[in-house]
């Protein structure tokens, strides 16, 4: 910061002393305010611009800092430096969030929760940008803007309405699995400390020999998963609409540090055809009895952020930010997010958002990305191109990336193994009877919206009947709709 921050008296942004920070410059005691009062103009102009645009999703959130520590050796799977050996610690910043609702909205609403981790590794940052649920609503990013529009408030009234949500998703049967999480008891986490996290997508690990392995990341809280039922959520949210943010902050301040264990599931890409689903389908989970959870490390949050604007609002996560040893897969939704997230950060924070302290790597870094809006990196080099015989900068040592052969014709199509109903049915049947009853009640209430047509109601009953026949029958009976299957 500027030395002006150490001044015993107020100054302007340029450092000039301010002898009266309470009164405007006027013509006499009661006269008009003068435009030449530069300090007033500067103060108001700064105030008018002190909020960056709200995130289009994940606007409501809370951040904390800490470390990730490797506890188990997985160097046979990846050459990632931050996973090089047990005991290695990497500083992190984590942001939890709700997804659909606005900044400042209650943290007790039924909504997925974001779980994003930025690792400041010795080989650059790694952003693992996930949610608390292991699946997603859609598998192709082409649908993403429409999906968010449907989940967001009505553009005419600015009221979030169930009929819009169920109308859109009546065209998207792949969403059923996600709804078995969202409409389940875990649809409203008790707070951020008591919820799972997931990388959601299938990623790729690459070892030193260049062998690729599909991977899914899972965070498990050491204090267990706890959720709120509707009456509890109404009571908690009515008393404090920022209860989860306060719980996170107060717990860390008291030395009760939240901790999660990191587990992975891995799959040999050569074995992907052995399953009745596509392993790159983000609407599917991998069976843990066949692909068991393997421990990797632990995440500990032991420091609250110092400034909400700098370390929460200006904090930017992008799934495109990976490190050697970790790579993407051909998951269509992940491929879309690789572009979309960095693009929205450039809109929200400016083209140099990665220079902001919370987003900048903590390791040495160099490139020729110069100037532009909001650039504040002081550089005095004469060489701003590559290569050059006047500059010793060279290529880094080569590291392995996936070498999969891609063949096929250009086409817009759905994946072959959609299998939209099996996993939702299995998950519903895993619920206890009282949990099933609460799930049914939530769907009956939602499908009873007066603007939902008989056709849409029938489609949803058909979908749930294909997932589980008894579930469809119960919904049809309570809604007085004849099941079509």
Curated annotation (Swiss-Prot):
Location within or outside the cell: Peroxisome
Induction remarks: By paraquat and 3-aminotriazole.
Originating gene: CAT1
InterPro entries noted in UniProt: Catalase (IPR018028), Catalase_AS (IPR024708), Catalase_clade1/3 (IPR024711), Catalase_core (IPR011614), Catalase_haem_BS (IPR002226), Catalase_immune_responsive (IPR010582), Catalase_sf (IPR020835)
Cellular component GO terms held in the UniProt record: peroxisome
Name listed for the protein in its UniProt record: Catalase isozyme 1
Reactions mediated catalytically: 2 H2O2 = O2 + 2 H2O
Top-level EC class as recorded in UniProt: oxidoreductase
């Amino acid at each position: 910061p500027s030395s002006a921050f150490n001044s015993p008296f107020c100054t302007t942004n340029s450092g000039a002393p301010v002898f009266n920070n309470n009164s405007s410059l006027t013509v006499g005691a009661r006269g008009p305010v003068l435009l030449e009062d530069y300090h007033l103009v500067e103060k108001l102009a700064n105030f008018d611009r002190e909020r960056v645009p709200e995130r289009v999703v994940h606007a409501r959130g809370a951040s904390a800092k800490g470390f990730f520590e490797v506890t188990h050796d997985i160097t046979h799977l990846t050459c990632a430096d931050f996973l090089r050996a047990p005991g290695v610690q990497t500083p992190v910043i984590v942001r939890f969030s709700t997804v659909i609702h606005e900044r400042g909205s209650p943290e007790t609403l039924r909504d997925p929760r974001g779980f994003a981790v930025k690792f400041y590794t010795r080989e650059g940052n790694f952003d693992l940008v996930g949610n608390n649920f292991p699946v997603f609503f859609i598998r192709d990013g082409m649908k993403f803007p429409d999906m968010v529009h449907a989940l967001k408030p009505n553009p005419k009234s600015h009221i979030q309405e169930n009929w819009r949500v169920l109308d859109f998703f009546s065209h998207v049967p792949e969403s059923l699995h996600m709804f078995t999480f969202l409409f389940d008891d875990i649809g409203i986490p008790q707070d951020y400390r008591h919820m799972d996290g997931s990388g959601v997508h299938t990623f790729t690990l690459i070892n030193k020999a260049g062998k690729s392995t599909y991977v899914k990341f899972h965070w498990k809280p050491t204090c267990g998963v706890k959720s709120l039922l509707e009456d509890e959520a109404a009571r908690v949210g009515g008393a404090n609409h920022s209860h989860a943010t306060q719980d996170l902050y107060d717990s860390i301040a008291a030395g009760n540090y939240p901790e999660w264990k990191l587990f992975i599931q891995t799959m040999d890409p050569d074995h992907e055809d052995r399953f009745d689903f596509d392993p790159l389908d983000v609407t599917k989970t991998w069976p843990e009895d066949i692909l068991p959870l393997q421990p990797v490390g632990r995440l500990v949050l032991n420091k609250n952020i110092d400034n909400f604007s700098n370390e929460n609002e200006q904090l930017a996560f992008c799934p495109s930010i990976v490190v050697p040893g970790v790579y993407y897969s051909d998951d269509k939704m992940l491929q879309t997010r690789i572009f979309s997230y960095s693009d929205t950060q450039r809109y929200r924070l400016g083209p140099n958002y990665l220079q902001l302290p919370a987003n900048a790597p903590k390791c040495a870094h160099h490139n020729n990305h110069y100037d532009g809006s909001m650039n504040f990196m002081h550089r005095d080099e004469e060489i701003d191109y590559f290569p050059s015989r006047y500059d010793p900068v060279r290529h880094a040592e080569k590291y392995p990336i996936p070498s999969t052969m891609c063949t096929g014709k250009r086409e817009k199509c759905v994946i072959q193994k959609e299998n939209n109903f099996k996993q939702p049915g299995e998950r519903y049947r895993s619920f206890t009877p009282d949990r099933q009853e609460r799930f049914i009640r939530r769907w009956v209430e939602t499908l009873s919206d007066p603007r939902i047509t008989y056709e849409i109601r029938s489609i949803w009953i058909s979908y749930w009947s294909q997932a589980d026949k008894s579930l469809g029958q119960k919904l049809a009976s309570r809604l007085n709709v004849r099941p079509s299957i």
